[in-house]
Amino acid sequence: MEKLTILLLVAAVLMSTQALIQEKRPKEKIKFLSKRKSIPESWWEGECSGWSVHCTQHSDCCSGECTGSYCELY
């Protein structure tokens, strides 16, 4: 009887630990995704250039495409 009680207690602890771990994961994903800005926010704050603006590298453009020294449309 004592062995069964101990086994049930261990199982309960393991299940509650697993539930806590799974509960924290979605919060971490939300924090990661919320740190990223949308393309319009980046453009509005001047972090990237819009369409048909002079550029020197892909990262200069909000679309990520610098072709022929000008930003491409998305």
From Swiss-Prot:
Chief place where the protein resides: secreted
Q: Where are the transmembrane segments?
A: none
Location of this chain's protein in the cell: Secreted
The family annotation for this protein states: Belongs to the conotoxin O2 superfamily.
What does UniProt say about this protein's domains?
The presence of a 'disulfide through disulfide knot' structurally defines this protein as a knottin. The cysteine framework is VI/VII (C-C-CC-C-C).
The signal sequence is 1-19
Supply the residue numbers of the propeptide(s) excised during maturation.
Answer: 20-46
A GO cellular component term found in this entry reads: extracellular region
Report the protein name in the record.
Conotoxin VnMEKL-0222
Instruction: State the disulfide connectivity.
Output: 48-62, 55-66, 61-71
- Extract one GO molecular function annotation from the record: toxin activity
Q: Which organism is it from?
A: Conus ventricosus (Mediterranean cone)
